[in-house]
């Protein structure tokens, strides 16, 4: 009898265990479905490689601004996955002094330009066969890195022959070559330098050698090409210049610096250091001698690679670093077994790990239609709190035991998932374009609730006479704007004509000076001949009187 009772108890305990196990599995399954909206599944391997957002170099205020800017881009469908990069967004924000509306317009223009120009495939599609001739008439190239790991770009402007350059290629083709080099810098050079320096790098150091710069280097066509390239750089690749050294700046450069400077952004000009012929100490403060070419006072010659400007020396030539640069999945941080267990034992992946290039959140429930899912994702992206860093989580309490944490975490996630679906199902817009209206209405309701005791004050009506006056003023302002705009265009053309006339006058003066110098040399030769003849006559005369 006791054995029968014991068997019944064991059987009852077994059924309870089975039920608990079933409940546990359902909770875990529901938790996983919910967490799939925020995390990226990983394989448990010995190396435990998972994607970690490298945002340590972004301070707190900038990070909040970038996150807010990112949500603005998401709501306006202006964030393709390949451009979902916090550092890239930060560069655009800095270029517009953290004005989100101006930065958004700049971002939108950049996306349109990339589509019109075919930038995404320009590395594969465009071949610049005339590169050797172009480099012969326009010496330039990347050579090494500075002491902080940034690539160093060098141009010897005094050796540019603008006429031969535009005979070797066209403005349009050189413009495509310029864009291709920028794309290679962002896809290969910057990632390689980041891997070598173990920190994020998206800026470069530039050296412009202006020794011998004169009128022959920058004719009207060369200035037009320069203006087009600067517009591309400022509009589509902002904040990529860390600092610039202009060395060997002489009188010829000072003559041309004023018209060139007006094409540059004021913030860009603040990064430019104009140096004379004693530039070596300043360069060596920023660049190690082993990374600096010999003609700038460094130790590198690159004799076996055709010279420093042809060598393309840098970390991007390292096969291992190049592999990391070309393989986005290899640019992941490696975490320890302890960190991996922290994730396994109930901590949400969205609280610890974040992909380098964020993907849009996936579905919350599989039976929700695809056209509503994107709207849910965007709405939830706005409501999610900032993700704490891994170091912050390490300082917290130790996680619970594995079995308890899975069960508790799974049940909580399951319940929260159901609550979220019930709440969102009432507020999800029918179209993606309604998301902005939805968020605006939510903000209005919250503002209204925060000030329940204040009476609503309606705006005063506008009379017809006031409306007519306003329209007249707007018309006057438009006329003034058009007048000022036409004047500025005329003034720019007038300045260009004056500059061209001044350059032509300088050429004429140089020619006249050369002719005068030639005549002076001939006169001096004749004078020396006359003096020699007189000396000869005097010598004969003295000999005659002696006898």
Swiss-Prot record:
It is a peripheral membrane protein. GO terms for biological process: protein transport. The keyword Disulfide bond does not apply. GO terms for cellular component: Golgi membrane; plasma membrane. Residues 464-526 form a coiled coil. It is found in: Golgi apparatus membrane; Cell membrane. Residues 130-304 form the CRAL-TRIO domain. The keyword NAD does not apply. Keywords: Cell membrane, Coiled coil, Golgi apparatus, Membrane, Protein transport, Transport. InterPro entries: CRAL-TRIO_dom, CRAL-TRIO_dom_sf, CRAL/TRIO_N_dom, CRAL/TRIO_N_dom_sf, PI/PC_transfer. Transmembrane segments: none annotated. Its main location: Golgi. Belongs to the SFH family. Required for transport of secretory proteins from the Golgi complex. Catalyzes the transfer of phosphatidylinositol and phosphatidylcholine between membranes in vitro. PANTHER family: CRAL-TRIO DOMAIN-CONTAINING PROTEIN YKL091C-RELATED, PHOSPHATIDYLINOSITOL_PHOSPHATIDYLCHOLINE TRANSFER PROTEIN SFH1-RELATED. This is Phosphatidylinositol/phosphatidylcholine transfer protein SFH7. It comes from Arabidopsis thaliana (Mouse-ear cress). The lineage of its organism: Eukaryota, Viridiplantae, Streptophyta, Embryophyta, Tracheophyta.
